[in-house]
């Protein structure tokens, strides 16, 4: 059985971290996880599922002692593959894996945006360090064509990039009225109150401020924000200034994303820049109407695959009008659009497992240049 060590920067409830936890349940290989920082609540969940989680104890970006500690773990484990996730883990993990003599090193690039990577500016130094360590790996997985294009712009050779999008477990998000009622009771939301939902890290680029403004212009509508991050205080202050602090619920990070989505009536994703748009797909899997500004996961799909997912500009007036309209319309939450099935997690896990095999793009995984040509024809 192929033995794989996944190396990730941390295990908070972010999109990349949740995606790893999901893949661990579907990958047909033996997996362990190493987190550079603390394991946290998500790490505890992964351990309860039977997957070992190792904490490297990294104390900051300048903690160079983390590198030999990680290399020792990899050497002792004698893994067939090291698979890294997120910038810091990709840099440290590739170096440590090569120090330990691991035969195959894969990296997934989840969060490479335009001008930033995981919230840090993509300075010349950041790009140079990434390129230098990327060459130590066997292949880099891009979760969307947008990420692949940015990797190429950074100087990563196209033949080293494989596109494998994120996966969704549709069954986990199937609408459950009892779960909706229980989540609303726990959050102090009335069963009949209309709820606009936002899902993701509370950072300025997510533009949740547009949702606060929109809710302030609508009577009796609640805003449920699911996630944590540095913009929370600014959003809470904005809600107070707009006189709607009593109608905005900050739920924080949660392991029960399905329950949070069940409690919503519409998912609003006004982020101006996304590398994939996992939350949008999860909202669709939950039977929600979804309004978004950026979602690479939907960009290349036929319009009929996600009929109730619509793009809106970054304008509070447009969001107010559209959300008010959507909330007036009845919905059948049991209907899930075809777009969700296109990203079935079992298929994504099978693609990764093929990539773990020895040899260039083993088992039929395609270099991004081939898929880009297919998309253009």
Give the residues covered by each predicted segment.
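N-terminal strand-loop element at the rim of the active site
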Residues: 6-65, 150, 230
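Short hydrophobic beta-strand element within catalytic cores of glycosyltransferases
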Residues: 35, 289-293
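Nucleotide-sugar donor phosphate/pyrophosphate-binding loop at the beta->alpha transition
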Residues: 64-68, 103-106, 113-136, 149
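A short helix/loop element that forms part of the nucleotide-sugar donor recognition site in Leloir-type
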Residues: 174-189, 335-336
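Aromatic "clamp/platform" in nucleotide-sugar-dependent glycosyltransferases that forms part
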Residues: 253, 272
